[in-house]
């Protein structure tokens, strides 16, 4: 996954976003590759954070082929950064718990703080449009205020990142539930998907 991550970072043509993403991953690369994406629910395993983020980056890259009006650099930057705050929010890949900062601040605010710090160290103008929209796609990726985002998506790329985040998380949760389910039976309730059960067909059609 490390090589794949490097390839995605290199693909970011916007020089501001490229330098900022490179700086943050220079600092957090090792943790990013080892951490889970969550304590429970989706991608809650060692390396799950990188697996989830890179899955979204791959989905975004393919989606731009269908919808060229989307800004690929913004989507890829957002995909790589959106959950990077998990390396501060969570204690680690083993016996994962929430840290004090994770409980009281949360990963969305934590990564936004890191983006601001990195931008200041790089002498970027935080009031420039390119910095504001990058922060926006990261801050808005949970989609709704009640789900933890301080703002709702107001850019097409922000809405797309939110939808891809939901899609990738949902598929991983369904896959995990169905792997433990006998053919011709329903899975246990999946908490992260409104406590719904999912059916595993008896045959592969």
Describe each region flagged by the PLM.
Residues 4-12, 23-24, 114, 137, ...:
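Residues that form generic nucleotide/phosphate-binding pockets
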Residues 168, 198-199:
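Amphipathic, Lys/Arg-enriched alpha-helical patches that create a basic surface
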Residues 162, 186-191, 202-205:
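N-terminal intrinsically disordered, cationic/polar leader segments
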Residues 2, 17-18, 131, 157, ...:
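Alpha-helix initiation and N-capping motif
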Residues 28, 41, 189, 194-195:
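Glycine-rich, flexible loop/turn motifs
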Residues 11, 27-31, 117, 121, ...:
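A structural signal for alpha-helix termini and helix-coil/disorder junctions
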Residues 1-104, 128:
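Acidic/His-rich, divalent-metal-binding segments that scaffold phosphate/diphosphate chemistry
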Residues 51, 65-181:
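Divalent metal-dependent catalytic cores for phosphoryl transfer on phosphate-bearing substrates
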